[in-house]
Amino acid sequence: MIVKICGITNREDAQAAVDGGVTALGFIFYEQSPRYIAPEHAARIIERLPTGVWKVGLFVNVAPAEVVRIRKAAGLDIVQLQGDEPPEDLPAEGRVWKTMHVDGPLNTARMDAYRAEAFLLDTPSEEVYGGTGCTFDWSKATGTGRRIVLAGGLDAENVRAAIRQVRPWGVDACSRLESSPGRKDHVRVARFLKAALSEATE
C-alpha cells in the first residue's frame, strides 16, 4: 500500500518521513496554499531523496504544458491534479492522479473520463483545495473498483480504521501531522507511518 505524506516544504521533514518508511512525498505547487513550495526549492529536496520514494507534485488548475514543464524541472514521478481540471486538461504524458472531493456518492462515470493512474479522495471545502484536516464519510470510498488514495483528516489515531474500512490502494496525510502550516511534527509523522504501514501488512 502507498503511504503518502503531503505538504513537504523542507529537507528535514522529508527526511523524517523517509526515515519512517514513507512511500510517497507530496509537494504543493499552489501559491495560495500555506504549504506552497517553489519548484526550484522542491527540486533541491527531491534530488536527495531515495529513488524508491515517489515524488508527487500537486497542482490546482494549471495549464497542462506548465504542469509538464514543472514535472520535468522538479524531477517529479507523479502529477496530482487537485483542482477543477476537466479530463481534457490532463497532461498527455506521465503518471497522473486526480483528486475527487467527496460530498456524496462517487460519480464513477466522471472518474472513467480521466486517464488517471489513481484517484485521491479528499474532503470538500468551499475555501481550500485540500488540507482541511477533516474526514469525510469513508463508506463513499468503498467498492469503486479503482485505485483509491484515501485522504482527508488522516492521522495515527484514525488511519488504521480507515484502511480496514476502505481497503485503499494508498493513504495520504498532511495537515494533521503538522506543528504549524507547512511544518511537520516529526513525532506525529513517525506515529502515522507506523500505524499505516503496520495495518497495511496485517
Features from the language model and the residues they span:
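Conserved N-terminal beta1-alpha1 strand-loop-helix module at the mouth
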Residues: 1-202
